[in-house]
Structure formats: C-alpha cells, structure tokens
Amino acid sequence: MREWMVAFLTFVIAYQALTDVPVRPTVIVAVVNLMGLFSSIIGNEVAVRYGRRRLITIAMWSSATVVGVLGFTAGWPYLLIAGLCVIHGITVSTDSASLTAGAVQAARRGYRGTTLALHSTFGFAAGFLGPLGVGVVLDVSGGDSVISWGLALLSMGVVAALGPIALALVRNRSKG
C-alpha cells in the first residue's frame, strides 16, 4: 500500500473535491515510512518477549484487515483516512525484522547467507509484483471510483491474509 498511498490519498482529495487538506499525501507517506522503521524494531522486541509466530500473525492479520477496508473509505473524513494509512504503515512493517530474524534462525548452518539472499529476493519480488497486481485491478475495475480503489486494496488485503494462513498450515503440518 505504501507504493499506492500517495495515489490513493490524491484520489480521496479529488473524490471529495477538497481544495485544501491539512496534511499533504506526500507528508503522510513520509511519516508512514519513518514510522515503519520504528515499528519493525519494536515489533521484533515484542516478538522476542511474546513469540515470533504470534507477533507475525497478529501483524499480518491487522495489516490485511486495514488495507482490505481502506480502499472503500474514500468518502470518510480525510484525516481519518490518513490515520488509517499510518496504522496500515505501522502494521505492515511490524513483522519485517521478525521475519528476517526467523529466516536466519531457521537457516541451516552454512546456508544463512543463501537463505538471506533468497529471503531478500522473494521480498523484493513481492514488492514489485504486488503493486502491479493492484494496478491491474484498478485498470480492470475502471480506476476512478471508490469501488475500483476498494477492490484494488481489498486484493492486496486478500494476498496479505495468505501469510498468516500459510503460517497456520505450516504449524499444523509440523505438529501432525
């Protein structure tokens, strides 16, 4: 969503015919990106205390829920939408350091560098393909309506929800 946040907030401004907003979309996204640094570090500290899998699952479900709803909110008060963008930015970053630490911990001795290289490659590939997918949904659905943005960001939420589902499946498989 961070890749689409300026465009979405600009759509909100146009949709509501706002002539002046208290905080520009670019400033909101800058705050979101800065908050992401802190949420990643704090998220890993929480994961150390309360469990990595638990933190990652909660962060992924929270992120998926917020982004899944966000696109349908274009008629809501601008500052409320901006606040939801910040919340999403925090939740989407909360599990970042924990996922990387988990990848290192799960790697076999002698393969940590390779594991991190693959972890990074898959992460950047998803970071490239995800926004393309959102763009396709926007294009196919018309792109200039609340429904279009709702469906586009909902598609992102659905994909994000696959993370905690995959964690649950892996956990059940390892128990069984």
What is each PLM-predicted segment?
Residues 7, 98-106:
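Intracellular helix-loop hinge segments at the cytoplasmic ends of transmembrane helices
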Residues 39-52, 138:
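Helix-to-loop junctions at the C-terminal end of transmembrane segments
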Residues 1-37, 130-131:
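Extracytoplasmic gate region of multi-pass secondary transporters
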Residues 106-142:
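A late C-terminal transmembrane helix in Major Facilitator Superfamily
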